[in-house]
Design a protein with these regions (language model features):
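Thiamine diphosphate
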Residues: 1-113
Length: 115
């Protein structure tokens, strides 16, 4: 008997075959990182930024669609005004621990830039 396939599988399913697009896989990547960190007893947060006009333009839209899943795992998405500012924002989000201001064990980041 085959299990029902749900549209939410792309972000909720943890094993077996998962049907998703390449951009949805990039959205899933930080969700997986958060789960791996939790398995290793790390209380991390995530920060994603990038330029809406980047060559991977649909990424911001897909992140917005997945906002519920990002919020559940303390992953924040903030579009950048340009690629450089997006990358700088990710770097800045990771600096809290250096000044003893962080509320997490660390922040993993993702910034899409066109090289």
């Amino acid at each position: 008997m085959q299990k029902k396939i749900s549209l939410s599988d792309k972000y909720e399913k943890r094993e077996g075959k998962i049907f998703l697009t390449g951009i949805q896989a990039l959205v899933r990547l930080p969700l997986i990182q958060k789960d791996l960190d939790a398995q290793n007893n790390l209380n991390t947060g995530g920060f994603i930024s990038g330029y809406k006009g980047s060559p991977l333009g649909g990424y911001d839209l897909e992140l917005s669609k997945a906002q519920k899943y990002l919020d559940e795992k303390s992953i924040f998405h903030q579009p950048g005004l340009n690629e450089e500012l997006g990358a700088t924002a990710v770097w800045g989000a990771q600096q809290g621990e250096f000044k003893q201001r962080g509320k997490k064990d660390g922040v993993f980041g993702l910034s899409l830039i066109h090289i």
